[in-house]
Amino acid sequence: MLTSLSLTALALLPSANALVRKDGVGRLPALGWNSWNAFGCDVDSTKIMTAANEMVHLGLKDLGYEYVNIDDCWSVKNTRNSTTQRIIPDTQKFPDGISGVADQVHQLGLKIGIYSSAGETTCAGYPASLGYEKVDAEAFAEWGIDYLKYDNCGVPSNWTDQYSSCVPDGSNEPANGTCPGLSNPAPAGYDWTKSNTFTRYTMMRDALLGQTRTILYSLCDWGQADVNTWGNETGNSWRMSGDISANWARIAQIANENTFRMNYVGFWGHPDPDMLEVGNGDLTAAENRAHFALWAIMKSPLIIGTALDGISDANLAVLKNKYLIEFNQDPIIGRSAHPYKWGYNPDWTFDPAHPAEYWSGPSSTLKGTLVLMLNSENSTSTRTAVWKEIPELKGHNAYRVTDAWSGKDLGCVKKQYSASLASHDVAVLVVKEAC
């Protein structure tokens, strides 16, 4: 039986100083595409340029999607340039080098990202950046890179942490968001900025800040070393969990975990629940909608992870939902939506199978309040949004409402709105002026 997590304890969690960059880079959640979920190691310039061209052709660029990110396996394996010590792009995959692809991406009015790791090798065994931070940052800047995803693989034993941190992820069998079986836990009150993980990630931050080119820094340390407490002074997004996979159980686990990280969301800083799986695996249409909607209202980075040249109209429509993107990219209100009621569980319950089901958040771009209702159950069920329960809507009994999926004006809705939802589906409402 799951118990409840204390709201008081959450309120006492510290906030971090934000890493403010030039030209607003990193102020809002990043929007873009990444090669890994679609292609893994099978990446090359053709696939990157196909994605870039499709982002323009499909109208994604017009909605704010701008980063085209190369993930792991882009370089020659097992060696660096003996003269410059730089990582060597694989010319079989990238005949014009990374800079050549960057030029083509920039010509489309888009930005380009690259991948490395805070270890000696990447997750796929390619050269990584630990000990070469300045060399690699200089190369990335020279090549025209705009975004760095920095992973946590290949860490040698002398760079591992003294203590283990609690990441209440799926495989850890978390008890109410804690890790009772954790080996070698840190003592209470331990300052994780003293950890080797913090040092490894700040070394690359400082190397990037030393370049004249502004490169968005996306930390991928899988939630380790209590990164939520220092991620925002180090980068503009930070992974708060282990990797995602294209199945509902994993998506629900990460959504549940990230629910308890919303106090860390704000301008310049965004907990990252990993790249999108919309269009991948055996996700149902309902699950694709719920996945994207939850990531968007949490003000997470929205990094597409599917092959865009074969995407279905239905999945493309999900990724292009203007209401959710406008909420995610609000230039005036930095906070995310928050759960106002858990629904399936008592409030503040940590349940990897049943995340909080009722969410709301104010939006300057939508000129109203976004309301989300999730059916986390395995069968069709009704969810009801009661206006007086929603913090932003307690002043009146009736409001004008728009269905964010269909765009339909639902008219003046009195007291509450009910929706019959298929398993793992969501209703998303834009609630505007009183009527």
From Swiss-Prot:
Covalent S-S links between cysteines: 41-73, 123-153
GO biological process: carbohydrate metabolic process
Name of a matching Pfam family: Melibiase_C
UniProt-annotated location(s): Secreted
Residue numbers binding substrate: 221-225
Residue positions of the active site: 151, 243
Keywords from the UniProt entry: Disulfide bond, Glycoprotein, Glycosidase, Hydrolase, Secreted, Signal
Catalytic activity: Hydrolysis of terminal, non-reducing alpha-D-galactose residues in alpha-D-galactosides, including galactose oligosaccharides, galactomannans and galactolipids
Transmembrane segments: none
Known function: Hydrolyzes a variety of simple alpha-D-galactoside as well as more complex molecules such as oligosaccharides and polysaccharides.
Family, as annotated: Belongs to the glycosyl hydrolase 27 family.
Protein name: Probable alpha-galactosidase B
Organism from which the protein derives: Penicillium simplicissimum
